A protein has these predicted regions:
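Ribonuclease/tRNase effector modules and their secretory precursors
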Residues: 1-112
């Protein structure tokens, strides 16, 4: 078995540490079920959707985690232009919205 070498960006470690901890302790990171390459003014990156409804953003080589967040239904649907194949994940993120997880992940630094 080849060891997995993934590192976290300084942004993930410093500015998103509370969010990442919240995800790890609330719903877990999960297994990758879909991926897509995205590009913006900073360049290309890979977005990974997990079976727990988390989006993990990595560098183009999938060696460095840049950030992550709990997806909302629209973000899950963006991975499936032909229609969502994994309805379980869609139901999960809708349940997370009912519980306010998407909002809570962003309030961790504020002490909430």
């Amino acid at each position: 078995m080849t060891p997995l070498h993934i590192r976290f960006s300084s942004h993930a470690l410093n500015e998103r540490a509370d969010r990442i901890t919240y995800i790890a302790t609330t719903i877990g990171f999960g297994e990758v079920i879909a991926r897509k390459v995205v590009e913006d003014k900073r360049g290309k990156a890979v977005r990974l959707l997990t079976d727990t409804g988390v989006i993990i953003v990595t560098d183009i080589h999938e060696e460095c985690i840049l950030t992550m967040w709990i997806a909302n239904p629209t973000q899950v649907k963006d991975f499936y232009p032909e229609g969502v194949r994994n309805q379980a994940v869609l139901r999960l993120v809708k349940k997370y919205m009912e519980k306010g997880y998407q909002d809570k992940q962003n309030k961790q630094k504020k002490g909430n």
